[in-house]
């Protein structure tokens, strides 16, 4: 199974039925599979904090959900986490595709990548980086179970080691021979 198939199956196993997301190249296979699966309701969001708010509201109405976004979009959700999800003990699942590491060309992505984990730590939000297929299902499954058991949010970060990263970003890297034409 691919990483996206494993994530989708693990969400299903844990009765997570809502996927609120902001479109992202890396997450595309996962988002397309969720949209094509009748077990899921997918909701596109204009901003990442909107996706988190959608998941929080759905949980209060009895529906389990996950907010999916890219690292740079994570920078927008601080207020939603600090003023809604954390104080009201909402088990919001965040699935974040990681950019800003391993040869990233975009300085904005690198800055956000360096602040993401410290921000999660400051908010007391458990987070795990998923880096290989061998441990993906176990870590994601236990993270989701812990979130719903403890009524606390969790973030799972999809490393480029797992997803292959963003091909568009890789194409922008400057080789030792100089910029690509």
Predicted regions and their residues:
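Thiamine diphosphate
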Residues: 1-181
């Amino acid at each position: 199974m691919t990483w996206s198939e494993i994530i989708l199956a693990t969400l299903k196993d844990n009765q997570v039925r809502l996927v609120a997301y902001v479109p992202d190249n890396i997450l595309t296979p996962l988002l397309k599979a969720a949209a094509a699966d009748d077990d899921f309701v997918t909701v596109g969001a204009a901003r990442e904090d909107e996706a988190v708010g959608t998941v929080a509201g759905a949980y209060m109405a009895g529906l389990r959900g996950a907010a999916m976004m890219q690292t740079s979009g994570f920078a927008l959700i601080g207020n939603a986490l600090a003023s809604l999800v954390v104080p009201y003990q909402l088990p919001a699942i965040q699935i974040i595709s990681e950019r800003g590491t391993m040869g990233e060309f975009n300085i904005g992505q690198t800055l956000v990548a360096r602040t993401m984990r410290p921000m999660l730590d400051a908010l007391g939000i458990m987070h795990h980086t998923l880096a290989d297929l061998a441990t993906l299902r176990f870590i994601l499954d236990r993270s989701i179970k812990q979130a719903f058991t403890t009524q606390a949010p969790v973030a799972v970060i999809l490393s480029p080691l797992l997803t292959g990263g963003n091909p568009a970003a890789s194409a922008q890297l400057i080789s030792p021979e100089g910029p690509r034409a």
